[in-house]
């Protein structure tokens, strides 16, 4: 029945030929509605009401199971501390995007000397730093961007499009906020080493895209930390020939 419903909602339901709403409840918690529509508006028979109650019962448990599955799935792809997507999901999403042939850019942010930060100020303060960084990263994302906590002190940002200049500008702006803006009340002035790699211009698949961005960060650390390195072919050769400058770009 439509008793207890506002006149506006009742009018809309009648226009849709809905003659009743069955509330789906589990352990007294409302989890959904079953709308009952009938074109001739004739009263339901006792058998029809009984059948609808059975449908409602099974629908309640089906919806409950679906919610449990979604909650479990969400937990399996989410980092507990930051609510960002986790490392496992990063590999899944990046592989999937590259397999589809969609051009993309991958940014890695690595907090310099995070282990020392934890040792000096304690794990609680370290967790607070990670949470603050995650919050700022989330606030900076565009609609199609995705952020992941890749390791204890590393974040990944996946962006659609392989425009290196745009990703550099985005990263520089984000790092400015992380190190000098909203993080100014932190006990330690942090620095962040960043890497950028792109698909398909440089990387051929998702695994190589991740490997290349890790290499960019690695060489950024070698350059003294706090740098932004764009991965170029031949970057690894710097370890044999430090004079090679065309293989990478230091910002």
What role is predicted for each listed range?
Residues 53-60:
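Allosteric cytosolic regulatory segments
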Residues 147, 193-202, 208-223, 229-250:
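Cyclic nucleotide signaling catalytic output domains
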Residues 86-105, 115-142, 148-152, 156-160, ...:
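Conserved long alpha-helical elements within nucleotide-processing catalytic cores of c-di-GMP signaling
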Residues 24-34:
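Short hydrophobic/glycine-rich mini-motifs in sensory/regulatory modules
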Residues 1-18:
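Signal-transducing coupling segments at domain and membrane junctions
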Residues 17-25:
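A short, aliphatic-rich beta-strand micro-motif
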Residues 68-85, 93:
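Amphipathic HAMP/coiled-coil signal-transducing linker helices
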Residues 149, 178-193, 221:
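Catalytic core regions of nucleotide second-messenger enzymes
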């Amino acid at each position: 029945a439509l008793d207890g419903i506002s006149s506006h909602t009742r009018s809309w339901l009648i226009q849709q030929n809905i003659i009743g709403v069955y509330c789906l409840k589990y352990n007294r918690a409302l989890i959904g509605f079953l709308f009952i529509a009938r074109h001739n508006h004739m009263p339901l028979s006792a058998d029809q009401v009984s059948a609808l109650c059975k449908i409602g019962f099974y629908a309640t448990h089906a919806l409950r199971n679906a919610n449990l599955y979604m909650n479990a799935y969400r937990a399996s792809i989410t980092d507990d501390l930051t609510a960002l997507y986790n490392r496992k999901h990063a590999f899944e999403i990046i592989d999937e995007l590259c397999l589809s042939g969609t051009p993309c850019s991958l940014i890695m942010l690595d907090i310099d000397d995070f282990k020392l930060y934890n040792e000096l100020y304690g794990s609680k303060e370290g967790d607070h730093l990670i949470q603050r960084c995650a919050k700022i990263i989330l606030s900076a994302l565009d609609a199609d961007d995705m952020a992941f906590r890749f390791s204890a002190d590393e974040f990944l940002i996946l962006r659609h499009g392989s425009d290196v200049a745009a990703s550099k500008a985005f990263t520089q702006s984000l790092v400015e906020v992380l190190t000098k803006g909203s993080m100014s009340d932190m006990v330690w002035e942090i620095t962040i080493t960043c890497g950028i790699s792109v698909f398909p211009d440089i990387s051929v698949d998702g695994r190589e895209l991740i490997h290349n961005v890790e290499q960019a960060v690695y060489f950024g650390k070698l350059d003294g930390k706090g740098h932004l390195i764009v991965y170029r072919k031949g970057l690894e050769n710097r370890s044999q020939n430090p004079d090679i400058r065309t293989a990478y770009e230091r910002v």
